[in-house]
Amino acid sequence: MTGLLKRKFDQLDEDNSSVSSSSSSSSSSSGCQSLSCSPSSSVSRASDSEEEGPWDQMPLPDRDFCSPRSFTPLSILKRARRERPGRVAFDGITVFYFPRCQGFTSVPSRGGCTLGMAPRHSACRRFSLAEFAQEQARARHEKLRQRLKEEKLEMLQWKLSAAGAPKAEAGLPPAVDAIDDASVEEDLAVAVAGGRLEEVSFLQPYPARRRRALLRASGVRRIDREEKRELQALRQSREDCGCHCDRICDPETCSCSLAGIKCQMDHTAFPCGCCREGCENPMGRVEFNQARVQTHFIHTLTRLQLEQEAESFRELEAPAQGSPPSPGEEALVPTFPLAKPPMNNELGDNSCSSDMTDSSTASSSASGTSGAPDCPTHPGLPGPGFQPGVDDDSLARILSFSDSDFGGEEEEEEEGSVGNLDNLSCFHPADIFGTSDPGGLASWTHSYSGCSFTSGILDENANLDASCFLNGGLEGSREGSLPGTSVPPSMDAGQSSSVDLSLSSCDSFELLQALPDYSLGPHYTSQKVSDSLDNIEAPHFPLPGLSPPGDASSCFLESLMGFSEPAAEALDPFIDSQFEDTVPASLMEPVPV
């Protein structure tokens, strides 16, 4: 095919060159000669076939191939298909009428005579669409009238039988046709108004007596009685399915095995009487699983409902993409600002690192200045007019969310429970453990004694050494910041530094293990606590509302999401034995190094 098309293109080029050379219009440009390709090909075809009359009457040299009025025929290589109408219009309907006969094809539920039609039609009639609609309505009205007559006849027979009068003395009409049409017109109007006209449009089974009457009315004189016995055998074979084995199948006597089919079980002992354990049919066994069918049905309905919901959601989402957000959608956006952590010059180089290395800040914890006298809290806390900004750090933004809806109720339910993060969302943990105030932890603990401070410790504190916690806390305790404690005057700086040095050698997680946000599990807790009890004796000073170490994954997740868990359980045995609130003891005791 490609060679044939190429040959046609070559012929077109040769014809174009011959026609262009014989043209007498020397003023035609190259563009005009290129446009004359299609007319020249038409001229060559017209001269060969002699089918174009106007082109034969005009001499070739006098034609203007570049004229816009010149005829441009369609290409012989590419022709557009002629559009055909896609709709089908019916002009009329032809109805063929067939006489009734005994069918011998169907199997009715009762009786022995079946209805059929003759192989040749007896009449033919053509209707227009409007006429056929009217004929259908008339036929339905007639069927409904006949049904009403049958119902009326049955009602009269029931009344006579209830009264005890014999049918011969009652004088009832012998057939439906004997009932007058005028007597059922009122009932017919009521039935049409009630919507019963649509009922007659569906095929209804006729009883055996009605079928015999229709056959006799159609001219059938003799009804074959042999069909009745054949139909009875067919119905019996359909009802008699499955084997008649009693719980145990014998392949030699089982009807299913002899027929080469599987035993079937829809429910107990139907259609086959064998059980699952006693079936020995070599062809196998098929059981109806009702649970599987119901599960498939439920899954299908669920899938269809999900598809409908997804389609409706896409329909609702499509017009909403180009529209501006509504005021209700804007109200869903949180209006509170996210807390911005301090810069590295305030926290130090190790404040936000993730290498988990220890950084000792005990030497610089005492060189800090106290806050303003008018500020009752820690000087590092932001004032009332502080507006926190938005930081790109996603972890800081996640940890800065507050949980005001849960914390208030938990504080009212139990005293000393783990508080919410509302009181901790306005400052950074470095303000607690920072080096600017020696009594920062103690003063903050005293001012926030109503709730636990451990739930608000963020992830940035994992890199701080335990010495800053003890040093700041002990020095604050000497100033009387912690209520209910006292420092003996005989305690000097040397003992304090010795305690600090002995505690600074341990891992920071040993003290943070008691906190819910840094719980590493009961195994790590028991191992570390047993090691630390042999070498160090922790100071006795009360801390408000410490939470027991819970699950590591749940505590870490709750610390990220900002949800606080109530301290409903008792403290760790280590905390119970070391931190006692009942007996006031000295804050510090000499520890052997």
UniProtKB/Swiss-Prot annotation:
Start-end of Low complexity biased regions: 17-46, 351-372
Entry GO CC: nucleus
Region (Disordered): 1-66, 313-392, 478-497
Keywords tagged on the record: Activator, Apoptosis, DNA-binding, Nucleus, Transcription, Transcription regulation
Location(s) in or outside the cell: Nucleus
Record keyword Cell membrane present: no
Gene Ontology MF annotations: DNA-binding transcription factor activity, RNA polymerase II-specific; sequence-specific DNA binding
Protein's GO biological process: apoptotic process
Keyword Transcription regulation assigned: yes
Coiled coil: none
Chief location bin: nucleus
Family label: Belongs to the AXUD1 family.
Function: Binds to the consensus sequence 5'-AGAGTG-3' and has transcriptional activator activity. May have a tumor-suppressor function. May play a role in apoptosis.
PANTHER family in alphabetical order: CYSTEINE_SERINE-RICH NUCLEAR PROTEIN 1 (PTHR13580:SF10), TGF-BETA INDUCED APOPTOSIS PROTEIN (PTHR13580)
Protein name: Cysteine/serine-rich nuclear protein 1
